[in-house]
Amino acid sequence: MAKEQVQAITKMEEDFAQWYTDIVKKAELVDYSSVKGCMILRPYGYALWENMQKVMDEKLKATSHENVYMPMFIPESLLQKEKDHVEGFAPEVAWVTHGGDEKLAERLCVRPTSETLFCEHFSKIVQSYNDLPKLYNQWCSVVRWEKTTRPFLRTTEFLWQEGHTIHETAEESQAETLNILNLYASFCEDYLAIPVIKGQKTEKEKFAGAKATYTIESLMHDGKALQTGTSHNFGTNFSEAFDIKFLDRNGKWQYVHQTSWGVSTRMIGGLIMVHSDNNGLVMPPKVAPVQVVIVPIAQHKEGVLAKATELQGHIQKVARVKIDASNKTPGWKFNEYEMKGIPIRLEVGPKDIEKNQVVLVRRDTKEKEFISMDQLEERIPALLEEIHNSLFNKAKVFRDENTYSVTSFEEMKKVADEKQGFIKAMWCGELACEEKLKEEVGVSSRCMPFEQEHLAEECVCCGKEAKQMVYWGKAY
């Protein structure tokens, strides 16, 4: 059965989209529901999200952010208060029109995001500069009625965290925006082993209603970019629309400066597409629901299960570990846990017990070694760290090898047609050039990176004076 499972995974080189779908299903991360675009997060998938959520929640609380919960429903009149915001989300909004058989006096939007609710609340609770800042975070689900859906990457309903903060000064809100972006970047790199590029979105790509949007971008196995997280500086755009004022230190009324930021289960999609292979999922150790699986060999023989249980007791002091004592064959179990991407597999049988050793197999490299049972508590944490670093470095090498610098429109078109990955090119800052590159080359601007390079004097599209270097690419 397990071999059939492995064979059923489409090779990523043949059909990347199907390879991805096969993995999320066969690794038992999700199942499809009866509503298009709504996924069922199975225990293994939800445990992964819980581990990610736990780390992020601790980091946010350590920086004085507080968790709150806003309602799921937004009155239509409230949603329409910020013009750019409502226009940006209008095509994706799901509406509630009836309560039972009774038609509602006003339509209710099922939240696509909660800016308007936070703004309404802030306008009621802020009076003076003494009430600032307010640093709020919410864990919830949101609904966006997507036309094309794929598990984790683009779903009608998804889980996320959304942060909303208000500040006394423009400097404070800008610092918050960038601090959160850095928090997201370190989470991706230090926990998910996904290298990111930090930068600012163009006017065309920024969040509806924002003064500026900052992003972390990652490169997937198929050469497409994934926007892994965003942080927005609203300036006073929303506070003016919602009349969120405070008395400043000079006794004058001022509008608050505001931020918004979020990451979602989309990160799980990124994790899959950066690390996994044609044998299944590859889990970054720090967020893996199970870090070590023990497979007893000839478990019916006396002492084998007892020894496996003893080892579990030692290992659980340093890692998340499970024993598979089911009646399935060892071969089935090997394939099953390879499919699920568990970082380390330990095999222990009668001969191993005689030699006081176990067989240790790494999921990421398939490397096998014999290790003394007495060394496991020390070896496993070090190996998990080694696996994390190996996954990160491998992903970074892949990204760097698939990043191309171009200086002309023709060169850019040729690279976009023949290669897959990021394209670095200079840009004049004009919307017309950005749209032309989208239409004629098939790439969108991913970000204006903080780490700028001067590749040429002229814009890659129009030849006019360039203002900055931009990462371009095909994207999810």
UniProtKB/Swiss-Prot annotation:
From the Swiss-Prot or TrEMBL record, state where the protein is found: Cytoplasm
Keyword set for this entry?
Aminoacyl-tRNA synthetase, ATP-binding, Cytoplasm, Ligase, Nucleotide-binding, Protein biosynthesis
Q: Name the InterPro entries on file.
A: aa-tRNA-synt_IIb, aa-tRNA-synth_II, aa-tRNA-synth_II/BPL/LPL, Anticodon-bd, Anticodon-bd_dom_sf, Pro-tRNA-ligase_IIa, Pro-tRNA-ligase_IIa_arc-type, Pro-tRNA_ligase_II_C
**Domain of life of the organism in this record?**
Bacteria
CDD domains according to UniProt: ProRS_anticodon_zinc, ProRS_core_arch_euk
EC nos: 6.1.1.15
**Record's Gene Ontology CC terms?**
aminoacyl-tRNA synthetase multienzyme complex; cytoplasm
- Which family does this protein fall into? Belongs to the class-II aminoacyl-tRNA synthetase family. ProS type 3 subfamily.
What is its quaternary makeup?
Homodimer.
Q: What is this protein called?
A: Proline--tRNA ligase 2
Source organism per entry reads Bacillus thuringiensis (strain Al Hakam)
